[in-house]
Amino acid sequence: QVLTDCSTQVKKGEVVVVCGPSGSGKSTLIKCVNGLEPFQAGAITVDGISVGDPKTNLSKLRSRVGMVFQHFELFPHMSITDNLSIAQVKVLGRSKDEARDKGLKLLDRVGLKAHADKFPGQLSGGQQQRVAIARALAMDPICMLFDEPTSALDPEMINEVLDVMV
C-alpha cells in the first residue's frame, strides 16, 4: 500500500508540489487523479467529477486534465506541430487549422515556434519537454499534472522547463 489516509484540496490557480523519496507514491497519486491508476479506498474529485465513480467517463475527464510525463511521450514520426494538433482534432473536434494555430501560439509561448516543423528527435530533451507542456496546454486543461518533468534532463536544461511550468 503506497498511500494511506491522505487528503488534500487544490484550488484553481494553486501550485502544489508533492515531494518524497522514490517509491513513496508520487507518480501513483497523480496517475490516480487522472484515472490512469485505480485506487482501492477514498475519493478523488476533479472539478466536481468523481474519478472513482464507475459512471464517470474517464476519457472525457482525461481530456480535461493535462499530464506531462517524465519522458515526454511525443510521437517520434510526427512533426512538432502535428504532435500539438492531433489530440485537439481527434478529442476536442477542432479543425486542423484551428489546432495548428493554437499549437503555434503555444510553441511561441514556450520559445519554440521556430522548431514547429521539426521532429522530436531533432530537439534537445529540454525542448521536447517544453513541447510536451505545450501539447498538454493545447487541450485547455482544468489542471496540469507533471510527473518528474525535469528528472530526465541535463542539469542545464532544468531551468528552461521550470520557467515554462510556472
Label for each model-derived stretch:
Residues 1-166:
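ABC family nucleotide-binding domain
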